[in-house]
Amino acid sequence: MAVQQNKKSPSKRGMHRSHDFLTAAPLAVEPSTGEVHLRHHISPNGYYRGKKVVKTKND
C-alpha cells in the first residue's frame, strides 16, 4: 500500500486542490449575427468582431 513520506501542509494541499473545480468557458456574442462563440475565436458563420474574415460554404 502506498504511504506518503512527508505530511503535506494545508497550503500545499490547497494548491493541489486548486484545479479541481471547472469553470464555464468564456463565451462571447457576435455583434453582427448575435451568435454565441468562444472568445478570441471566429463564429461558425466566419465572423470575428463584426467583420467577415473567412468564407464559408454558404457564401
Swiss-Prot record:
One term under GO cellular component: large ribosomal subunit
GO biological process: translation
Coiled coil: none
Region annotation Disordered: where it falls in the sequence: 1-23
Highest taxon in the source lineage: Bacteria
Keywords per UniProt: Ribonucleoprotein, Ribosomal protein
GO molecular function: structural constituent of ribosome
UniProt cross-references to InterPro entries, sorted A to Z: Ribosomal_bL32, Ribosomal_bL32_bact, Ribosomal_zn-bd
Family: Belongs to the bacterial ribosomal protein bL32 family.
Protein name: Large ribosomal subunit protein bL32
